[in-house]
Amino acid sequence: MRALVQRVSEASVVVEGQVVGAVERGLLVLLAVERGDGEKQLEEMVRKVARLRIFPDEAGKMNLSVKDIEGEVLVVSQFTLAADMRKGYRPSFSLAEEPKRAEALYLDYCQRLNQHEGVVVAQGLFGADMQVKLINDGPVTIWLDLPPQEG
């Protein structure tokens, strides 16, 4: 499971001209589910994102999480983060999970982030052609990569 996490002052997702998800201060998470991802990756990614300390405290040090600041998280599925570029110039997406299972894990991820960690979650629309708008705060961008299970 891979995630590109961006600290934002605002972010939104538009599908066919309609805003389907939006947040104010918080995080934008672009999430890719890979073949072999399971419960271990799901739980760890939920914890990592909810507890990632990338917001400034009163001294200006990155020491607070999105939970600490009572921020929001916009989660957008993005299978292209699973691109394999080891050969040639055209990306291979063979590492990405098949859509039906990927969608189930994506929705489970969003639900757990909200229910288990108490974070307000907005979502993109899985599998849709989306326009993502954001104001990156900092900018702060963090790459999280949790390898799939063996076998």
UniProtKB/Swiss-Prot annotation:
Transmembrane segments: none
GO BP term, pick one: D-amino acid catabolic process
UniProt short sequence motif Gly-cisPro motif, important for rejection of L-amino acids, positions renumbered to this chain: 138-139
Compartments (UniProt record): Cytoplasm
Principal subcellular localisation of the protein: cytoplasm
Enzyme class (EC, first level): hydrolase
Biological role: An aminoacyl-tRNA editing enzyme that deacylates mischarged D-aminoacyl-tRNAs. Also deacylates mischarged glycyl-tRNA(Ala), protecting cells against glycine mischarging by AlaRS. Acts via tRNA-based rather than protein-based catalysis; rejects L-amino acids rather than detecting D-amino acids in the active site. By recycling D-aminoacyl-tRNA to D-amino acids and free tRNA molecules, this enzyme counteracts the toxicity associated with the formation of D-aminoacyl-tRNA entities in vivo and helps enforce protein L-homochirality.
UniProt similarity note: Belongs to the DTD family.
Note on domains (UniProt): A Gly-cisPro motif from one monomer fits into the active site of the other monomer to allow specific chiral rejection of L-amino acids.
Subunit structure comment from the entry: Homodimer.
Protein name, per record: D-aminoacyl-tRNA deacylase
Provenance organism: Magnetococcus marinus (strain ATCC BAA-1437 / JCM 17883 / MC-1)
Chain's gene name: dtd
